[in-house]
């Protein structure tokens, strides 16, 4: 079972987040890590927490967790990043910390939620206006999006389509399409696991 | 393993209710037992899937119940969706995402006509345009909220610095004389107040004479801009065209801090918004504010007995009337003197019992010989 640090109820939001981060770093239990990461990722949805999260370096914690073997941890970490990346300060931090390659790696995850969060994060990281981040519109990424746009999953199809329409130039899309015809298999499509029916 | 369907209206992983987590550490247990799940903007949707509705023909009641949380654009039953025996599955589309979020939060796990509802999002029903709009709104919301927050944070910093330099302020106030001090207070409050709270500039303005108003209006705007950009209070103070020596002492002693009752007022009026202040600090704040008001009042009214501890309302002075007779005047003076003695002796003992002061104070005052 996870440890139980003594937390004063009056310690406030920052104290609570600090306790979560500490537990994540110290615990040996995978369950506890998942719970704490999910908790942090949900906190990342609310902009009022961003100052605290930056202070506690939770953004780096999320980025580091992207390399974990546990797929659930990756899913929660990229979910957290997806939640907080529309904020300008957070976005800059992620870009400076070299987060883009890590997020692009998530596109090859077998977990559909991970892929969806990764696509959304990349979209939010793109600079405003029609200028594009070169890494985001590199051919492998565009090819990946092209394959996603043919997926059976509606959510994946929609997001991929928005990416191609809003965040790539038509020339890049055409180029990727023509190369795809010749290249070997690219990034595999994710699968979503649904339980058997009764 | 592929899902049982990519088609709409089939079972998806995110529709399945996860088991509640029962291994949470005590300090992070919430009020309701919850599963371990992360909600992102991708998962949330204006479309809600409602499972577990008893098949007793209650579609109308269901929709009415959900409509409490916001306008519903459309709704229909999902007949092909795998459902438990004797239950139905419905899809409800709300006009906006926020209503859907509220409805989900409130209605999930609620009892309805004998059944337990399971409410979840169904983003797979969105069109491309709806998804695009959803993402754009989320981004706009975050950007707007953090921009507003930045200004509250600036104000917060000013307040904490203000508390640190309380002593500085007291010294400064005692050194300078009436109007100059008022002008200085006006400068600091106008210059360092939150640009998003314009009334914080106006409050001290209406306290003091109109002489201050015209000259400080211009610098206020420039000051707000520069404080927004650089948070460099040296620069903001530099814009002022008042007494130079006054300004210099200000800069030297106060540096980056705010010190004036005006800023206090602005801060307390928006206290409820963002700040968490422990009760003892609130009491101290109120006491300090009372003292400042008193000091300002005394400066403007030139009260000779400036060191009195005043509790309760300031009663009007008894007017001195000449009786045109020496003995009568002596008597009157004696009585006045006695009254003054009695009044001044009252505050000392009941520092422990302020209520007694309030009640005994007017009693003694009204005694007539």
Curated annotation (Swiss-Prot), chain A:
Matches recorded under InterPro entries: ARM-like, ARM-type_fold, Armadillo, ARMC7
ARM repeat placement: 57-99, 100-140
GO cellular component, one term: spliceosomal complex
GO biological process: mRNA processing; RNA splicing
UniProt KW keywords: mRNA processing, mRNA splicing, Phosphoprotein, Repeat, Spliceosome
Record PTM Phosphoserine, positions in chain: 169
Pfam families listed in its UniProt record: Arm (PF00514)
Subunit structure: Component of the minor spliceosome. Within this complex, interacts with RBM48.
Biological role stated in the UniProt entry: As a component of the minor spliceosome, involved in the splicing of U12-type introns in pre-mRNAs.
Protein name: Armadillo repeat-containing protein 7
Lineage: Eukaryota, Metazoa, Chordata, Craniata, Vertebrata
